[in-house]
Amino acid sequence: MELGRKLYIRSLVNVAGEPLSYFWPMRNFVYHNPLHELEGEHFSKAIKEGEEIFKGRAFLRRKDYIDFLNKGLIKEEKLLNSLKENVNLEGAPLTYEDLLRLIKDEKLKVYENTYLIREADTDLVEKLKGFFSENPKEVMENLFSEFGKKYTIADFVDLFFGESVNRTVNELLIKLSLDFLDEGQSVVEMPRRKEGFFRAFRELAKYNLRFIIRGGRELGELMESFEEPEEAIDNILKSYGIPEELWERYITLELAKLKGIAGYIKWRSHNKHYYFQRVYPSDLVEFLAVRLILEKGILEHRKKVYPFEPTYENFKRFFEEKIEEAFLTYEYATKRVPAELSSQVRENLKNAESFINTYLSRKAHINASNFALFLKDWLGERVKELSKEELKKVLEIYGEFQEKEGFIWLEALEDSLIERLTEGVLRANQEKEKPKAQALFCIDVRSERYRRNLEKIGNYETYGIAGFFGVPMAFVEIHKGHEEFLCPVLIKPRNVVLEIPKEMKEEYEVTHLLEHILHDLKQNVLTPYVTVEAIGFLFGFDFIGKTFMPYSYSKLKEKLLESKENVDYIINKPSREEVKELVNRVYETILKRVFEHEYGIKNPEKPLLEETLKVCLGETDYSERLELYGFKGEKQREFIERLRKVYKVDRGYWNILFERLSKLGFTLDEQASLIGRALKMVGLTEFAPFVFIIGHGSKSDNNPYESALDCGACGGASGLYNAIVFCRMANNPEVRKRIKEKFGINIPENTYFVPGLHNTTTDEVHFYDLEQFPQEVKEKLKEIKEDFDKASMLTASERYKELFDEEAEDELRKIYKVVENAYDWSQVRPEWGLSGNYAFVIGRRELTKHLNLEGKVFLHSYDYRVDRRGFLLEVILSGPAIVGQWINMEYYFSTTDNEVYGSGSKVYHNVVGRFGVISGNFSDLRTGLPTQTVYKEGKPLHIPARLIILLEAPYEFALSVINRVYAIRNLIQNEWVNFVIFDPESKKFYRYKKGSWNELKTEVKDG
């Protein structure tokens, strides 16, 4: 295959894969909008695209919205306004009250394809009958026009031949994909995985009975005929005769049939550093090629039983020349046939031409009768007075109403929520008292409850900030041996923090410490793998315990794990000279091992090691000292070449180690910038004696979605380490000095930053890293901890009602039950997570401090008065606000269609490959949130509304910043979020809706 064509196919597949969202490994669940790649489109257009590509619903059922209406979440006046905005009744014999009555009655609808149990008015049926007549030719033309947009060859084969090609392909491809993508769960490894997905498939399919039985000889021959995946894609699509202009969308449809696995492969292929991607490469091109080969092979194997060869032109000819048969088959397969005609249609599929007129007439009569009964129920006796033209208009209005009903409900819900929030903000009390202590919490909605209860107990001032606290870092927890990115997925951290045993840090400087970790190289069998990876584990290679685990280090680790009090952290960055010295020492240690174990040179002198390293690194051409040990001339050159190739002692690997170690820690200037910027962003410039930095995490047993309950701003991990590192930096006198110089923020000597963790499953808060404080400070912290414990009890008691359907007067019983939830391995719902989230407030705490937001609002502290140029607001709008929208959309779509966009019931979940879950023994990867997270007793607990972002800032200032941030501007203009600006100087609200900013009239109502 020529290179140009190959590159074209590859780029075509990558573009076609754009609508598919990433799926991250479950151990670091990352909230995302399932339609994230469609955010460049308006929300209303994107959800239609999602329906066509993924077959997913974007709105709830009417009865669910009616339930919201009855609970007061939706106000009737907002529902009426939404009807007026979305449905034009000009010239129709209807009122908006008629539509309101219709939308409020769950049973008031046309019951299509059901047996008639009542007699419809004959005259009315006759008037309506003509509106329900169908033209089979037009129906089939419209259907074929959607080929490549909504349907594939396999879809048409299943639809018109009564086959199950898609299911068969999915079964084979799911098993193949999960075996290939396995990350250590499977006992037997799939052969030839290292050669990539396509070649591993070709090898396996030769001998595997599943492929032989389903695809027969034809699949084997087809598979052998293609050496490259691009060649397979090109040839198979051409063999179907599909016009090339349809290929891009056609490929999208094929990939979307297993959107979970395809999304995971897409994520892996875009993250080349990911260990399993490096070792077992795969991409969408290979995945698509395998899918098309399986599909084509099965079609070839079954070709003899088909009425014609399934190609683009043959289906077109079938629709044109056998209209009646095609039409009736389509009607029957898609369940468009009225129930009472179903058996007759089945019997007459091969006699379609003579039966078609009878069918069309009877179907029109049945549908007209159904609609007549519906009109009678809706409009009463006045329907009899309507003329034929008026009935036609009513039918048109009803069609428009059906198309827009979900959007009508959504806008009414959002308008109601916005009114409730803005009314509450207007009641804000701006008075402030000198606080006893201050606390920074994550913006997570679950923090709102705790903050409110803590403020209620005592004079505490709380702030909200993204839960990585403005400190993006890769963190190496000692018992894991590999790095975690503790920051939003939008950010790739440049600095690494290392957790180590305290006794090691006390004994060694940084350089000596890291060398000590590698000390046991002398005691281990040397391999090329170990030489490179020996230090790599600090920065992302997960091999500790698998390949290289020195005994003394292992014992230190065991001791460390007994208590987190025995740990310390490398936060300060070593100098470049220190890093250079360390890398040289590592390589000298390796060289020493080589001399001793392979050449019998005991205790080689340091000058020999240094000179040998210089030659290996190309700093000198030859070593006379090596000659003294018998390495002369050609023998020396061969020796050096061996060191470079086998033991990786060369400039390239030296540079890699140097680069990785250079990422360790933060300079003092970096620390001052991070802490100063975070404090200024939330408006914290005057300090109480204690400032608590409270990260959050969750605790639940037997829960593959545990990371979905942790901190999204920390990449699905706990926020504890970010809190600890933040406090270590903020408590450093040298850092404080630089903060004062750079930001003008003076942190008093007697102010202490204390890290803590809020367990959102139990609502307990614990303080950490207390050994660094004097004894008198620890005593004061004990008193404050009592207040935090009281806040924990109040918050747990508040959450009890949502978690359990029972009443309990005993407060201790409530708290016990909530805590017990975390440790019950059979519990499918340890907590509600972020269910119910609907708003994101950016502003001072005084705006919402008086409100009970029920743990459903993100709260990000921000004071526009200290941000004259809007740079801090830019950071919030381009980071935390975007992550908030991702979370909101994950919950939104997991609620509107839990089977397609969510992950179904946890009861049927099985962990596969250590990276994902499937339902039962066979399904695509489940990508969204489980039913138990968003539903309670069959009803949605989450409120699926687009995120309401409320910003406190002067109107013109806010607009200028919004216009500078493309990501948020795009979401606003395409109406993926509802954006409201509260101008505190004019006390006015402004909202973006339907293409423009307008003042939002809000007033405080009595009660």
UniProtKB/Swiss-Prot annotation:
Query: Which molecular function term from Gene Ontology is one that the record holds?
Result: zinc ion binding
Q: Does the keyword Transport apply?
A: yes
Q: Which cofactor does it need?
A: Zn(2+)
User: Which InterPro entries does the UniProt entry name for this protein?
Assistant: DabA (IPR018752)
Q: Is Membrane set as a keyword in this record? A: yes
- Oligomer and partners: Forms a complex with DabB.
HAMAP family per the UniProt record, alphabetical: DabA
- Quote a single Gene Ontology cellular component term: plasma membrane
What's this protein's name?
Probable inorganic carbon transporter subunit DabA
The organism named in the record is Aquifex aeolicus (strain VF5)
The family note in this entry says:
Belongs to the inorganic carbon transporter (TC 9.A.2) DabA family.
The record's principal subcellular location, in a coarse class, is: membrane
List positions binding Zn(2+).
Answer: C442, D444, H696, C711
Membrane disposition: Peripheral membrane protein
Query: Where in or outside the cell is it found?
Result: Cell inner membrane
Ordered alphabetically, the record's keywords are: Cell inner membrane, Cell membrane, Membrane, Metal-binding, Transport, Zinc
User: Its function?
Assistant: Part of an energy-coupled inorganic carbon pump.
